[in-house]
């Protein structure tokens, strides 16, 4: 399975949802960097299951155990390796899934690709549980970025079509960026959050689920970070964001909305702010030609409704080659959007930190 991100950083995610452990290795972090384990644990707690009425009742401590790369709280130059032990699993809920694939899940495609040898319990390696090690890597990168004056934050932009307020794409301040992450439900507008919770509760009562949108921003980036074409900042961030299993779309700046604008509306006019070049608007999301322009980097990720729902659904028996019905057992989130917010932050942090390391390496070359 291809679960490796390769750049100046090499990030490799391993494990399955109901395996003894899940984990990550991160190679390429310079020696001597401080990692605050309490801050990392708090970041992981935002993703952890069992918090909020919208979350699965499966509870996991999600406490990372570092096996390599960290000595007395500082990186030592060896690959950073950490595992999280899986302690609350009920694999019996998944026994029939090799024969009857769940709609909306990777059961069928995994069966075809891996010939029946894949681990189906809890979704195996395809599970959203694997975003926990992604958050270990991203949580470390967030800390390293913050020490450079670069901050990553996100909030729920919408759930079930109910919109939150948006980040200010031009004048976003650090306090406003980070404030949603301090809340149990990471929104800007608390009244919108209450309506979202109502929509989640309604879907849950109907044995259904809802999806939504997450908006993420990065502040403090210098102009000139990234590359054209295949290694642009959009490419890097999108690749890692799509590692989150529920993400089905990513857009930057005005995104698909630019298709309805004229050039005179979409262009972001430049102006001088002292010695600094800025733009009056930010439809580009802080990226032009794959390269940052110094404005806030803003993007959004579309998160699908949880595919595991309690309603009886149509499926097939692969062994009998006939249509059948499926009723999914187990513990599932009626909405995974709130728990996905730190995952999107993690993806952005890895991409940005990796790009910074690459830029620094280039500047060191004669």
Q: Regions from the language model: what does each represent?
A:
Residues 1-366:
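Generic N-terminal targeting/processing segments that precede catalytic cores or assembly contacts
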